[in-house]
């Protein structure tokens, strides 16, 4: 039995290794090192499309211990003259000296390393080369960086808490994922768009599609997510059938991909929207920043989520958690801002870890008229929500584990499973990014006045009957724009 368990564990480790290797499809270019006389050296790689950061970490005549920061620890955030270049103008190197180093590149929003680098000084480069230079002792003067606004300096690197794709990050405070959406379409190396009907646990009144510019497009450096009607998008009424085809991202030959409105009490969903998620990027602990402009339409939920990579604590009903960085709801003439650590799908447990920032009507807090920065700081002990740099919500395990959460006398059905994790479980596993729009549904609006009843067999039709009266105005207010997303290690 023990041998069998060891074999299973070994097989799982091997599969994980293959998965990680499959993700690392990009190889960091070999660093070019030039040493100058009487002092200074450069480390560089060639520029290429997709690189947004190059980092160098090194020590002189002393091997690096793993991914330590080293004597030199610098991020270069802009290429010059076709190369990403780290420059030291102070240190004097002599023949026989050895530079030990590792480099790091963010390519297409993902981080890659070249580890265990070493370089032995055999001579000098450039016009200052000298065949017989005098022996110059290594400077012990602390290194002082040049005043270069294009260089982001991080000396005294601290051990990070963040993990990315199952591996520890190199240093706290580093940019590990970024997309500023400046291309003509979503980067397929970073994102995967959904194409499926909605389902449990919220059964939204929409289908997600991946090929409709009316619901998802990139323009002026923004992702624009919009709502559309089934009638406009597919020229189909409620009582007709719709097959999303081989590109469906749900389970084939199920209600994820095919529905016949004639056989359903509620017919086809009346709305079409979009949703996309990070393809090969997931992380545990970090700082997520999203600059976005929210929709104002009633019963449209903007999705700026973190979703679990693996259902460690349960598959259904958000038992493995969902982190909502930000979403909004109309409230009279104002727009309320919410954040949430969702532990279960049904009330009263669903909203027990919600945070609310009531709308004030002030221009500075009109979440739909202008862009705002929505931030989540996720550490092993707490979750902090910020908007425009100001903290407005904290949820943590200092006063008790999340597994102990109760509401109206009810406990979490997965509480015993959560006790196997940390106090912050289920938020002690890797999560991935999700952006999108959903419309209506069950659970999402349980406490709000709405034209449909929870679990009613014809809830979608009741929703559409109400919205149809104000369709054009409602659609005009059903947009969300995202300027950028950035993830930093902590």
Curated annotation (Swiss-Prot):
Reported effect, residue 213 to L: In strain: Netherlands line N02, Netherlands line N07, Netherlands line N17 and Netherlands line N30
Localization per Swiss-Prot or TrEMBL: Secreted
GH16 domain residues: 162-490
PROSITE patterns the record matches: CBM39, GH16_2
Keyword Secreted belongs to the record: yes
Glycosylation sites: 362, 373
Pfam assignment, any one: Glyco_hydro_16
GO cellular component: cell surface; extracellular region; extracellular space
A GO MF term: (1->3)-beta-D-glucan immune receptor activity
Alphabetically ordered keywords of this record: Glycoprotein, Immunity, Innate immunity, Secreted, Signal
Domain of life assignment: Eukaryota
Signal peptide start and end residues: 1-25
Gene Ontology BP annotations: antifungal humoral response; antifungal innate immune response; carbohydrate metabolic process; detection of molecule of fungal origin; innate immune response-activating signaling pathway; pattern recognition receptor signaling pathway; positive regulation of melanization defense response; regulation of innate immune response
CDD domains associated with the record: GH16_beta_GRP (cd02179)
Consequence recorded when altering residue 479 to N: In strain: Netherlands line N22
Family: Belongs to the insect beta-1,3-glucan binding protein family.
Function: Involved in the recognition of invading microorganisms. Binds specifically to beta-1,3-glucan and activates the phenoloxidase cascade.
Protein name: Gram-negative bacteria-binding protein 3
Species: Drosophila melanogaster (Fruit fly)
